[in-house]
A protein has these predicted regions:
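FAD-binding core of flavoproteins
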Residues: 81-186, 190, 200
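Alpha-helical interface subdomain recognition
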Residues: 1-81, 165-306
Length: 306
């Protein structure tokens, strides 16, 4: 049995990274923090042109007919670049649920990011059509992830379908957390190789090495759980919910450890908004409290075990 990703899956990941390297730079993110939409102009269309948004839709509906294992690496890349678009909400949650690729989906339990640009909105209360919903802007620590409280009368969603969609969304967020952790550690490693103190690079100090090594270990323990959760979704494993919650809890912890290590090793400059680190730190903080926090997912795993 093969447990590694195929060449085609890795090629799609690399193509996504190439696109985002050019089209979702820190400069693009800074613009998204201050522009009217909170998004990168033109990026959504490019992701759609690549087929990313419809990867899980059947070919008969205009999708690629792929599985969540194919999608998870792409979602990890969208985390690495802190993409300010509802990719998880559309590609992982909404498209498989609705069987359509022509809609932009926003989803969350309560306050919903990017609800103002969606066609259909899902919350814990049910499904809202954008035209019939009232949106109330709410504060967000991440200026490119604008939140809205959705008010109106929702339509019910089938319980089984809602749970499956939720698990896909949670796994997608966990994958993004892995990408964010990787990005913050890479930025920090580059910084400590160049920053000099007492005549040497700060990366030569043992304490700095330990911070980054421990954070890297946490990330490498989280990744396999995310990939297993993706495989469970793809194969409809009866323990999918447990695997997804394990992945989210571990990925959140890894991202938060990477964030702490990044701040500690950067020092004062890491706290400034002029430096790019905060763009990724704040996204990881926001995602850790989205789609169920650590306590929720630990409890979900515990209930399945006990």
């Amino acid at each position: 049995m093969r447990f590694s990703f195929s060449d085609e899956q890795l090629a799609l990941r690399d193509a996504t990274r190439d696109l985002l390297t050019k089209e979702c730079t820190p400069a693009h993110l800074r613009d998204a923090w201050t522009n009217e939409t909170g998004r990168v102009p033109g990026l959504w269309a490019q992701l759609d042109d690549m087929g990313i948004l419809g990867m899980l839709a059947p070919e008969s509906a205009g999708g690629l007919g792929l599985t969540f294992v194919d999608l998870v690496l792409v979602l990890e890349e969208t985390g690495r670049f802190a993409v300010p678009e509802p990719v998880v909400e559309t590609a992982a949650w909404g498209v498989p649920l609705l069987g359509r690729t022509d809609l932009t989906i926003a989803a969350s339990e309560h306050w919903v990011p990017w609800a103002d640009s969606a066609d259909v909105i899902f919350t814990a209360a049910g499904r809202f059509e954008r035209a019939g919903a009232e949106l109330v802007a709410r504060p967000s620590v991440d200026g490119a992830r604008r939140l809205f409280e959705v008010q109106g009368t929702p339509s019910p969603v089938d319980g089984g379908e809602a749970i499956a969609a939720y698990d896909r969304g949670v796994c997608g967020i966990a994958a993004q957390q892995c990408g964010l952790a990787d990005r913050m550690l890479d930025m920090t490693a580059d910084y400590v190789r160049e920053r000099r103190q007492f005549g040497v690079t700060v990366g030569s100090f043992q304490a700095v090495k330990h911070h980054l090594a421990n954070a890297r270990i946490a990330l490498e323990f989280a990744r396999p759980l995310v990939y297993r959760a993706a495989a469970s979704i793809a194969t409809r494993d009866p323990d999918t919910g447990v695997h997804v919650s394990m992945a989210k809890a571990k990925a959140d912890a890894a991202a938060q450890q990477s964030a702490r290590a990044a701040l500690q090793c950067h020092g004062a400059i890491g706290y400034t908004t002029e430096y790019d680190l905060h763009l990724y730190l704040k996204r990881s903080w926001a995602l850790a409290r989205s789609w169920g926090n650590a306590k929720f997912h630990h409890d979900r795993v515990a209930r399945a075990i006990l």
